[in-house]
């Protein structure tokens, strides 16, 4: 079982976190959505190498006050935003004929498992529904609070928008966190 990382757009924040910290921990980098090489100087692989039971880490920026989109800031400063529908369709298209395999997806996007109100749905839950709808199989894990990369598969700061802000204030603006706990993650079966 292999861990693959996908940053759909050339986003300098995620490039630093995913490529420089996590990839030496035995991960493989998939090309950006436009097909460009994910990272020069590291093993870049193609989507047809993703097999059943592999882990596919999806890196994006969650939005602080919305569960309708995730985003990436490209090198030229433009921001690309994807809805759960667009994200699921992009994954499906990239996997091509391999889309029906059981894959362990991990969404690394701040507040990916948080909803805004008790009756709202998180981005992760919306993405899981869309992924199932386009025929993707396996599981999707998303995390509450702010997430980032550290060591192998991530770190977590707080478990909500409020506790994340309190943690940052308490540590004078520094994002300090720990490994995600079981109650900080939500898993959906696809």
Spans of model-derived segments:
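Catalytic-core segments of thiol-dependent peptidases
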Residues: 2-117, 168-180
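Active-site-proximal C-terminal subdomain of hydrolase catalytic domains
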Residues: 104-190
């Amino acid at each position: 079982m292999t861990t693959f990382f996908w940053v759909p757009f050339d986003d300098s924040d995620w490039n630093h976190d995913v490529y420089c910290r996590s990839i030496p921990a035995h991960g493989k980098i998939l090309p950006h959505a436009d097909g460009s090489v994910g990272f020069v100087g590291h093993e870049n692989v193609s989507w047809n190498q993703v097999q059943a039971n592999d882990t596919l880490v999806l890196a994006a920026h969650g939005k602080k006050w919305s569960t309708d989109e995730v985003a990436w800031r490209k090198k030229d400063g433009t921001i690309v935003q994807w809805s759960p529908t667009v994200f699921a369709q992009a994954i499906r298209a990239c996997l091509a004929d391999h889309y029906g395999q059981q894959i362990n997806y991990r969404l690394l996007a701040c507040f990916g498992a948080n909803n805004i109100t008790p009756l709202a749905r998180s981005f992760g839950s919306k993405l899981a529904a869309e992924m199932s709808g386009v025929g993707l199989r396996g599981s999707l894990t998303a995390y509450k609070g702010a997430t980032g990369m550290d060591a192998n598969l991530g770190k977590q700061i707080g478990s909500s928008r409020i506790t994340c802000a309190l943690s940052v204030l308490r540590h004078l603006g520094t994002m300090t966190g720990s490994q995600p706990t079981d109650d900080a993650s939500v898993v959906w079966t696809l």
